[in-house]
Amino acid sequence: MAVADPHRLILTGENPFLRLSEKDGDPNSTDASYWRILFCPAGPGHVLYVKSEMTHGHWRIYSDNIAMARWLQQTVQGMLNAELKDTTIPVIDASFSKSGDPRYFWTEHIKAHDADIAMTWYDIGEPLLIHTEPNQPPQNRQYGVCTVLVPAMGARLTINGNQARGTPWKRDREGRPFSTCALAFSESWTEAR
């Protein structure tokens, strides 16, 4: 028997991410959160939030829907990373494309007036399905999520042909092999009614 989630659906799409560092346990030298949104109150679109030594340690935001990028900052992305609640960070207009086969590798391409960016995940691990409810202990996050996470033991970020320092690091998640870098497909976020 099917069960409908009792919470309000606020977005669905994809949210692959990169968290690179030069040594395991060091602060991230690159932190990148990429969204391909199919549905949310501010409409569909793409956005990349990225901070790296290649951005001089400052957040850069690239999007093809500024309203969606700002809505994410005020909701889910702002919850995931409080630094991104700052809606004074400029949003740079960009175009987006993808390539690859997620069983082997995946690349997201972002082009803007000042940057040609590629994010690539490879050495792909076994997918896992995660489902949390809004305000569920122990994290007590305001929003719940249902997503297919695909860990990547290899990943890189390039901006204008230069590769960011750092690598992904192995982690465990729910007792399964995971990484600091992953693809996140079929991702839906909910809030309590």
Where are the language model's segments positioned?
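Targeting-peptide/extracellular-domain and disordered-appendage signature
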Residues: 1-193
